[in-house]
Swiss-Prot record:
Helicase ATP-binding domain sequence ranges: 250-425
Membership in a protein family: Belongs to the DEAD box helicase family. DDX27/DRS1 subfamily.
UniProt KW Nucleus keyword: yes
Keywords assigned by UniProt, alphabetized: ATP-binding, Coiled coil, Helicase, Hydrolase, Nucleotide-binding, Nucleus, Ribosome biogenesis, RNA-binding
Protein name, per record: ATP-dependent RNA helicase DRS1
Compositionally skewed regions (Acidic residues) per UniProt: 18-34, 118-140, 171-194
Catalytic activity: ATP + H2O = ADP + phosphate + H(+)
Natural source organism: Eremothecium gossypii (strain ATCC 10895 / CBS 109.51 / FGSC 9923 / NRRL Y-1056) (Yeast)
One Pfam family it belongs to: DEAD
Region (Disordered): 1-61, 116-194, 660-734
PANTHER family to which the protein is assigned, alphabetical: ATP-DEPENDENT RNA HELICASE DBPA, ATP-DEPENDENT RNA HELICASE RHLE-RELATED
């Protein structure tokens, strides 16, 4: 009877008048269906014996419901408990045995208690009061005031402060004034050509399109004419009002036009391109599976984050599928997922080319939308070859969306993307930090050797309780690893994030930092772009970046989405580092926000005492690094043994696999890497010299330039003429 009933109601849509008890719940699990079947059979026997008593039972059951209960059909589930995006790759991870560095540090006496000099009772009380103030500020940020209450409390506390704090503030003000007046070396303009007005008018869409889009203010997402499933996804994430970049970009993207958009970090650029994509895919053919959207990102972590944003925004859209193609994760699992031809594929350039060339049943021939996140980074020389290859593989008739916080690429770079009259939308002035970011600078002068001790001192001052998330940026991965060991020996737990880690280790580091298991994350510029981890309070630049753009992306990890944040930068004496500080001060002076740039007062005596502790532990640091190296060698040897066993055991299957191909040969790879290295070491010229060189190129071959040999011969001739002239004068006098 049960199967008859299922077949009977399979092709019909039940109405309100139908009896729901007779219709089985096909979405329930097997266990639930068995228990439900027993209950229903009892009810049927009761119904057969007592015909009219069933109605009374139903009425009694409805009487137990609360008449004041209302369903929230806006899909607001998870609004209050939303804790950021998930950094988990697709598929189950294979268990890998890694070296337990924290265990080694504990065996050597680290990670027990915070080391340091003894502080007076007054300093401890000040630290506790500062911690309490920071807690109040965090509560204010989570409410509707978004930091306004905290600012008023801070203003009141500043008025009621004692004389000692006044002295400290005076010292910091003097330092800030001194910082403004410092000569940061000769101001060199970067070798960046500016597009002429004629070129821009010919390449871009009329400027009034972007200006009109920026001038329209949207108070809610309902005014953007979005469909109900998309609005439910936004409500589930707690999004109520579109940010300026979202309000300006979404209507134009929905029209199918190409877009080049730029806004400060943390302004919601990912949702700005993901919302119109999901809205467009609502009207796709239901029975034809094909990849219609390709999203390219420069880093793996950013790709995983973008995929999670898309899944959460489109969770109420039926039939919407996502695929992930990033390096470091299981290649076979990604192949299986891409065989199903997901609607949206988020990828890094190298891995997507690998899948296009070597994965069966996957193609990008039907791509309708191309999104390039962090476009200025993707247009640099490091990704140029891969990007050109991808452009040759996807259809030229498509919509292209470019997004970045420092979008200042020239038309020459954009031509390769085959853009069609793109609309240019720049919400904020280029090269500007977030409005509520406080930028502090510490001048090292001749104290470069004290940097590890200074970092530990700053971490203790900024967060003595370990309840804040602090990101430390360094230039090299070896430095990041060594700093993790040093901080561990001083009693502070820290994580690391750089390219030498496996992808599983990188994701684990991000998740530990996100859950506050590790309050300090020491990383390279790998984490400087796009990562959106909620409530990063402080960013410390241990090493200065190479350019001001990289500096903006680093400090953009904090003060996101209207929150307040702080960055502390250690500044050396090089001209390059001084010029970055000068650009930061100029940007703050020209902005209308509440951000500021100032110097930070440091107690160098305490730093020197901490430095003595670090020096005393140098032998232990060497022992830890050596022990870790030996354990890594053992793990590598075990892996090679397993690899050899698999080669012998599955020799036929391995040999039967087709060889994976690449679009470049080994010699071409070497040549491109050499060209990239030469371009990086290219000397920066100022604007006058560049214009002179351009004028000489337009004229053709430049005039002959004298060599050193020519100058010496000319000098000799001049001396001879002088001697001859002197002898003639003597003869005339005689």
């Amino acid at each position: 009877m049960g199967t008859k009933k299922v077949n009977q109601f399979k092709d019909f849509v039940p109405t309100i008048s139908d009896s729901e008890e007779d219709i089985p719940d096909l979405d329930a699990s097997d266990d639930e269906y068995e228990t439900a079947g027993k209950v229903k059979s009892r009810k049927k026997t009761k119904k057969g014996r007592k015909g009219g008593a069933v109605i009374a039972d139903d009425e009694d059951a409805h009487a137990d419901l609360n008449p004041e209960f209302h369903f929230n059909d806006e899909g607001a589930e998870g609004t209050t408990d939303f804790s950021g995006w998930d950094f988990v790759g697709d598929g189950e991870r294979a268990e890998q045995k890694d070296v337990d560095l924290d265990g080694i540090i504990r065996r050597k006496g680290g990670l027990v208690q915070l080391a340091g000099v003894e502080e007076s009772e007054e300093e401890v009380e000040e630290a506790e009061s500062a911690a309490g103030a920071s807690d109040d500020e965090e509560l204010a940020l989570d409410g509707f005031g978004m930091g306004a209450v905290a600012q008023r409390e801070a203003a009141g506390a500043a008025d009621e402060s004692d004389s000692e704090s006044d002295k400290d503030s005076d010292n910091s003000a003097e330092e800030a004034v001194e910082l403004d007046g410092v000569e940061f070396g000769d101001e060199q303009e970067e070798a960046r050509e500016e597009d002429t007005a004629e070129e821009m008018a010919q390449f871009y869409a009329p400027s009034n399109e972007g200006e009109e889009a920026k001038n329209v203010v949207h108070s809610t997402f309902n005014s953007l004419s979005l469909s109900r499933p998309v609005l439910k996804g936004l409500a589930a994430l707690g999004y109520t009002k579109p940010s300026p970049i979202q309000g300006a970009t979404i209507p134009i993207a929905l029209l199918g036009k190409d877009v080049i958009a730029g806004a400060v970090t943390g302004s919601g650029k990912t949702a700005a391109f993901m919302i119109p994509i999901i809205e467009r895919l609502l009207y796709k053919p239901a029975k034809i599976a094909s990849t219609r959207v390709l999203v390219l990102t420069p880093t793996r972590e950013l790709a995983i984050q973008v995929a999670d944003v898309g899944k959460k925004l489109g969770k109420f859209v039926s039939g919407l599928t996502f695929g992930l193609a990033v390096g470091g994760l299981n290649l076979r699992q990604q192949e299986q997922a891409l065989k199903l031809r997901p609607d949206i594929v988020i990828a890094t350039p190298g891995r997507i080319i690998d899948h296009i060339r070597n994965s069966a049943s996957f193609s990008v021939d039907s791509v309708e939308v191309l999104v390039i996140d962090e476009a200025d980074r993707m247009l640099e020389d490091g990704f140029q070859d891969e990007l050109n290859e991808i452009m040759s593989l996807i259809p030229s008739k498509r919509q292209t969306l470019l997004f970045s916080a420092t979008m200042n690429s020239r038309i020459k770079q954009l031509i390769s993307l085959s853009l069609k009259k793109p609309v240019r939308i720049m919400i904020d002035p280029p090269k500007q930090a977030a409005n509520k970011l406080t930028q502090e600078f510490v001048r090292l002068r001749k104290r470069e050797h004290l940097k590890p001790a200074l970092l530990y001192h700053l971490l203790r001052k900024l967060d003595s309780t370990g309840q804040k998330r602090i990101v430390v940026f360094v230039a090299r991965k070896e430095v990041a690893h060594r700093l993790r060991v040093i901080l561990g020996l001083l009693g502070m737990k820290a994580g690391e994030l750089h390219g030498s880690l496996t992808q599983e280790q990188r994701l684990q580091s991000v998740n530990n930092f996100k859950s506050l298991d590790v309050p300090v994350l020491v990383c390279t510029d790998l984490a400087s772009r796009g990562l959106d981890i909620p409530k990063i309070e402080v960013v410390i630049n241990y090493d200065m970046p190479k350019t001001y753009e990289i500096y903006l992306h680093r400090v953009g990890r904090t003060a996101r989405a209207g929150r307040e944040g702080k960055s502390v930068t250690l500044v050396g004496e090089s001209t390059q580092e001084r010029s970055i500080v000068k650009d930061a001060i100029k940007s703050v002076d020209g902005s209308k926000g509440s951000g500021r740039a100032c110097g930070r007062v440091v107690d160098w005596k305490q730093v020197e005492e901490i430095h003595k502790l670090v020096q005393a532990k140098e032998d232990v640091i060497g022992e830890i690094l050596e022990e870790e190296k030996q354990e890594k060698e053992i793990l590598r040897a075990e892996m090679e043994i397993r690899k050899g066993e698999n080669m012998l055991k599955f020799k036929e299957e391995i040999n039967a696999r087709p060889r994976r191909t690449w679009f470049q040969s080994e010699s071409e790879k070497k040549n491109s890497s050499i060209l990239q290295a030469l371009s990086k070491n290219k000397k920066v010229t100022n604007s006058k010299k560049r214009k002179r060189e351009e004028a000489q190129q337009e004229v053709g071959s430049r005039q002959y330039k004298k060599t050193q040999k020519d100058r010496t011969t000319n000098q000799e001739l001049a001396f001879r003429k002088q001697k001859k002239g002197g002898n003639k004068k003597k003869k005339v006098r005689k």
